[in-house]
Amino acid sequence: VHCESLEELRKLWFGENSSSIRQNPDADQSVEESFLDKETEFALELNNTSLYEEYLRQLLKDFLASYWQKNYLTHSWLAGRTPERFYIGNQFCHNLFPTEEQLFSIMDKMRSEGLEITLAFSYIREFMLPSVGKLLEKVDNWCCIHGMNVEIVVNDWAVAEMLHGKTSHLCPVFGTLLNKRKKDPRMKYKSGDISLFQQNSLNAEFYRDFLAEEFHIHRYEWESCGYPQEFPPGKNSLHLPFYQTNTSQYCPLYALCTTGDRGTQQLAEHCPKFCEKYALLYPEHLHMMGRYNSLFGVDKTFLESPEMWKKIKGIKPDRIVVNL
């Protein structure tokens, strides 16, 4: 199936005719009940300009109703609960972080609504170092004034170093770009022992100790990516249903829109936000799409079968992060 738009693709993946919505009478309802009883923290990502603007424009309940409706997940088991936390920013594209004015407006609104806050930073290019350092200082000051703690998702070692010397109000988190593992929607076509993929570097105790001692990192960001993972001791956040497979600082979508050739890539110094209107589409059976500077796969495992939560080996994530 070849879809004509991202909207059509989302409807095919998550709409009423999708197994993501259909209720399985044999499903273990205890998982959904424990989720609704808040045994696991629940968060949503605000990761692009349109979401920043919609959140600022609407009351929380109206924003959530619109969010689930636009993504065809109104009847999903996830939609039955109000998030306790929001992620602000994009882990994969530096041009999709909100403006400073937007950021503090969003943070003020979240504080008034009793929400916890996580700021997600991408890779940091050399020219960004001074501005990011100053922004972290302003966020630190905001936290001190309001008596709040804010998590900082780190996807560049420079940001981890910047957080040294800041107050305990800024809590570094190990981001997706640094938490590397093999991810590809085509892996389901491969034969072999997938158990070899279940662990990565964070399963090594000495590495976790290094992150804790050197950078005070105790939480790790993961993605649901189509096969079982063995999560390490500590605090683990699981992002779903989309997982990143490729990221380029030289945006292929920008190249395609400006030159007609996605291979003619260059740094988008003045980004016109083509990604607000356009995406790269692939045949539906591949379960993947291209958005802004990255490729993403979709893993509907937990949307379709929440009982799969019980099949996670080892430590279970203590936070679910929805990234539609």
Regions found by a protein language model. Give the residues of each.
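Active-site pocket-lining/capping segments in soluble small-molecule metabolic enzymes
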Residues: 1-106, 112-324
